[in-house]
Design a protein with these regions (language model features):
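Class I SAM-dependent methyltransferase SAM/SAH-binding core
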Residues: 84-142
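A short acidic, Gly/Pro-enriched loop at the edge of an enzyme's catalytic core
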Residues: 140-152
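Short glycine-dipeptide loop
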Residues: 79-80, 103-104, 175-181
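A short glycine-rich, Lys/Arg-flanked "PGG" loop and its adjoining helix->strand segment in the class I
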Residues: 98-99, 165-180
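Core SAM-dependent methyltransferase catalytic element
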Residues: 217-219, 223-235
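Conserved class I S-adenosyl-L-methionine
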Residues: 180-207
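Hydrophobic beta-strand segment of the Class I
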Residues: 83, 152-153
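Class I SAM-dependent transferase core
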Residues: 22-84, 122
Length: 235
């Protein structure tokens, strides 16, 4: 019975106008301890980590916990690429990506917190990184140029987006045909991952939400200790 109701709901979403379908996918509940009380496709959206917690992004244990070199290897980076780091924070990954795509490549480091972009710019300046361009986005728009991006990356960001469908649409517009979106999220399927439940996502949940925006699942990489790397492409 539940499956029939779910299928009916999906069919209704498919025949609605795009704006109406987006609104229908959102809901509200009593906020949980780590959530905001807003839901998307039945999932409560997690609270955002603000810029006062930026030190956590640069914690000494992060390399051991996340193995960034394994993620970078999975991204298929090449010199000259245009890459968007959406929810870039302090630039932990933006700087590493910049080194791999070279001076002819560009990293668009997107964040909605101006204070976080100040920290990012300071970090890039200290490290002598010149091919990272800060972009101040909004809750509904990444601010990325249309059809210009080879690869968009979100590391532990998607589950906190207050308007996930609008951001997915914005990313899709920014991707070149065949361009890829990569979501990195802590695995909800694994109880041993020591992260709060709302800050983890299952592969099935990620795929359900992203595929609803029209992007096509390509593969899932499972080489990271605690996170899965779910890769989609623009048709």
């Amino acid at each position: 019975m539940r499956r029939s109701i779910a299928c009916l709901a999906l069919c209704l979403l498919c025949i609605m106008q795009p704006g109406a379908a987006r609104e229908a996918a959102y809901g509200s509940i009593a906020p949980s301890r780590d959530g905001i009380g807003k839901t998307y496709m039945g999932r409560e959206i997690a609270q955002v980590m603000g810029y006062p917690g930026a030190d956590w992004l640069e914690r000494g244990s992060r390399e051991r916990e996340e193995r960034p070199e394994l993620l970078l290897a999975a991204l298929g980076l090449a010199p000259g690429m245009a890459v968007a780091d959406v929810g870039a924070g302090t630039g932990y990954y933006a700087g590493r990506i910049a080194a791999r795509i070279g001076d002819n490549g560009r990293v668009y480091a997107v964040d909605v917190q101006p204070q976080m972009l100040v920290l990012l710019e300071d970090s890039m300046r200290r490290r002598g990184v010149r091919n990272v361009q800060p972009v101040l986005g909004t809750a509904t728009d990444t601010g990325l140029p249309p059809g210009a991006i080879d690869l968009a990356l979100m590391v532990d960001v998607y589950h906190e987006l207050s308007h996930p469908r609008e951001i997915l649409d914005s990313v899709a517009r920014a991707l070149k045909p065949g361009g890829r979106l990569v979501l990195v999220e802590y695995r909800a399927e694994d109880d041993r991952v020591p992260i709060k439940p709302l800050h983890k996502m299952s592969e099935a949940g990620i795929r359900r939400e992203v595929e609803a925006s029209g992007l096509v699942w390509q593969q899932t990489v499972t080489t990271l200790p605690w996170q899965h790397v779910v890769i989609f492409r623009r048709p």
